[in-house]
């Protein structure tokens, strides 16, 4: 277990350096498993574009606050510096920032709670990873999901945290499956499935994210595109809720599953990554639907919970493919090939 008994004073002194900026950007990139500062920068550009386009600029600024707070917390807790250099303290925090300002009204107490929750994710991530280590999986984005659920539930009884944009608790009922099915419409739904990874409802942001992924890892971009398309196809043929389809809400967890299984935890080859990644994407769509039904009566969003559940389902069995070590899952924190940041200086 990482020592949490003293402040990383050297790290704190570097908070206003260019190295710290790169660490923040990598934290943004690590939401989709990319340890690349340029990718993180493009993700932030996409977040700002989509947030302002949708008239929700505070979502973008919440993302920045969450990213900074969760990263600084890693230094304050003196967590392993390698995790910090790779941006692994920041990715849950940036999602917390997006989530808070998507679902809660903006008050002083909302921002205070955002700071507390973002800081908590860094601590919780360490704990969850310690618990999951014997199973050879990690917590993925579940620290964001778990802590945000806690605060969103608390908002129901705390007037300082107005649940202004949360759905009211209700039992699942009838819904309309009718949507426009033109090629342009389907293209928008597909791109929104990618943009919703950061809770952004913008097809332009989806383009930003695809370009950002391609800058770091072309296969990550390809799997993101495939995952969003396949999840869209599945929810259409199974006649899911039209409003959810139009807003890309069945795509974002599948996108994360596709990247995770296709480029991170399974070695990229036809027999392992391709087969199991496609299976994981399919399962994610059904997990998404099931979790929607499960959480609707308490008025909670699924966030990236379906991605976590589906990915764990495909990692926990410790599959061994065809007896070849090269085709077996990589159960390390992240695949070593995704830890490089071409052109960036060594931060040691």
Descriptions of predicted regions:
Residues 15-23, 30-42, 63-64, 84-94, ...:
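Short hydrophobic alpha-helical membrane-embedded segments
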Residues 77, 81, 128, 132, ...:
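Membrane-interfacial segments
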Residues 1-79, 193-197, 206-216, 301, ...:
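N-terminal signal-anchor module of multipass membrane proteins
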Residues 46, 50, 58, 62-74, ...:
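Alpha-helical transmembrane segments in multi-pass membrane proteins
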Residues 86-89, 93-174, 296:
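Membrane-interface helix-loop-helix junctions at boundaries between adjacent transmembrane segments
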Residues 105-106, 154-163, 238-248, 286-297:
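Hydrophobic alpha-helical transmembrane segments in multi-pass integral membrane proteins
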Residues 53-56, 76-88, 106-111, 127-137, ...:
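Membrane-helix interface "capping/anchor" motifs
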Residues 147, 152-229, 233, 237, ...:
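Generic multipass alpha-helical transmembrane bundles of integral membrane proteins
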